[in-house]
């Protein structure tokens, strides 16, 4: 019998995996809890979001537990992955409103009844972090040299990467740890541009919890110029045309 991972691979969803043998073993052991993050820097998701949404739908249809994580906390910083310039900084009110809009959209694609899927917002835990404790307990597990070598930062290093953006990888990794510890989530999925951030999460879980966690990336939907289809690209096709 095919696992959900086999189905996703056959349908062309899989780009990179941390360890395919271990991921297949994870799916063979039973139902899997996975999560995908959604960036609330606009009031609507776009066509590039359909790949991760469809992946969650496949996971759910095959009896797995899915978590849609809206980045109400990380959105206050901005993800530098694949960007040549710093993102526009949005206010807390703007981020909160965008997060509500994305949540409503996700309810159209996933079944959240009876906790079949969970809609979470990382602002619920990231905004409550004690900075000194976070540096001591989490930050010490990160190598600056390895972070600077990550593809997600290479482009920005040429034009300037500020300290706020440099923290993004650490916060996303902490999200994975939080979901692993509190929801039994052992699999993160997302776009291929998130590979470095996702690996940081699996490493953090291994160092703090002493357990295996896994990551799977999807191919990116690109524009005619080969750029990632994102919220700031010209000609973006929004899922909510309004």
What are the language-model segments listed below?
Residues 80-96:
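A charged helix-plus-loop insertion that forms the helical arch/lid used to bind
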Residues 1-40, 240:
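Non-catalytic terminal extensions that flank enzyme cores
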Residues 11, 91-92, 98-100, 104-222:
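Divalent-metal (Mg2+/Mn2+/Ca2+)-assisted nucleotide/phosphate chemistry catalytic cores
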Residues 78-82, 129-135, 227-233:
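Short acidic, glycine/serine/threonine-rich loops at helix termini
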Residues 12-15, 44-45, 166:
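Short, flexible loop segments at the rims of nucleotide/cofactor-binding pockets, characterized by
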């Amino acid at each position: 019998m095919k696992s959900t991972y086999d189905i996703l691979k056959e349908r062309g969803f899989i780009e990179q995996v941390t360890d395919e043998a271990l991921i297949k073993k994870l799916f063979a052991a039973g139902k899997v809890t996975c999560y995908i993050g959604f960036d609330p820097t606009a009031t609507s998701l776009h066509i590039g979001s359909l790949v991760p949404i469809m992946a969650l739908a496949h996971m759910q249809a095959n009896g797995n537990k899915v978590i849609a994580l809206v980045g109400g906390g990380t959105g206050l910083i901005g993800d530098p992955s694949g960007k040549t310039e710093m993102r526009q900084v949005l206010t807390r009110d703007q981020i909160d409103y965008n997060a509500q809009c994305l949540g409503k959209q996700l309810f159209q694609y996933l079944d959240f009844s009876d906790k079949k899927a969970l809609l979470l917002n990382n602002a619920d835990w990231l905004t409550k972090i004690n900075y000194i404790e976070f540096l001591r307990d989490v930050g010490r597990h990160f190598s600056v040299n390895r972070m600077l070598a990550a593809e997600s930062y290479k482009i920005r290093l040429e034009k300037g990467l500020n300290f706020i953006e440099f923290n993004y990888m650490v916060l996303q990794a902490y999200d994975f740890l939080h979901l692993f510890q509190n929801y039994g989530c052992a699999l993160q999925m997302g776009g291929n541009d998130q590979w470095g951030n996702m690996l940081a999460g699996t490493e953090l879980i291994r160092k703090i919890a002493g357990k295996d966690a896994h990551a799977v990336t999807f191919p990116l939907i690109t524009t005619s110029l080969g750029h990632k289809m994102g919220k700031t690209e010209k000609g973006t096709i929004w899922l909510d045309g309004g």
